[in-house]
Amino acid sequence: MWNELRIRLRDLAAVRIRYGYRRLHVLLRREGWKVNHKLVWRLYREEGLSIRTKGRKKKISRLRVVLPQAKAPNERWSMDFVSDGLFTSRRFRVFTLVDHFTRESPAIVVDHSIPGSKVVEVLDHLAGLGIKPQVITVDNGPEFSGRVLDEWAHRKGLKLDFIRPGKPVENAYIESFNGKLREECLNLHWFKTIEEAKEKIEAWRKDYNEHRPHSALNDQTPSEFAENFDLSRAVEKAGF
């Protein structure tokens, strides 16, 4: 049994390159392996699977920022941009969205240029599908602080919550999501074309939503957490 477990652990680690032993342990449990995290840690070390990480810089002590807490899906989202480059060195941008409560990413857009009008187009498409937040946390970038998005938000009856300039910690949910995107996708691929970048980044978004266990969600995936929340709310409304 242990040899089979060792082989399966190696296989998972080969696919989930940036997953540590704790998240790999969750995946093994999901597959039916009845093993504790200590055994997985021992095999993980014996197989030399430890992730190489950069040494963390010592941070200056600062006051902890208390972020607004969402209590249901679509109460509060965050959105932001990430930059990367093709194999040819041509730059492209990634427009990211994340739900604070479920940690789901409702959409991700990749292109060489993403103006405010494109941001509105994406949000309007989601709203047409019945997916619309009450509040969106954003920075003060021109795509978010311009008139196009402001007018759209007013028409749709939602609030834009701008963080203070130079305070990305106030947008921690999207910063965390962007970090995972870079570590688990952008840093692992050479994109030859913008089409390839779109395909691989969208595939990562779907995998993140549907298959990636999230520690803040009690090791559920974002999609599982959202589905279970909707189910429990439906049961409450039915009076059971």
What is each of the regions a protein language model found here?
Residues 20, 114-116, 140:
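Conserved catalytic and ligand/cofactor-coordination microenvironments
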Residues 34-98, 104, 117-125, 129-133, ...:
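Mobile-element integrase/transposase regions
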Residues 51, 159-160:
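Hydrophobic beta-strand scaffold residues
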Residues 108-109:
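Short hydrophobic alpha-helix segments
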Residues 156, 179-240:
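C-terminal domain-tail junction helix/linker
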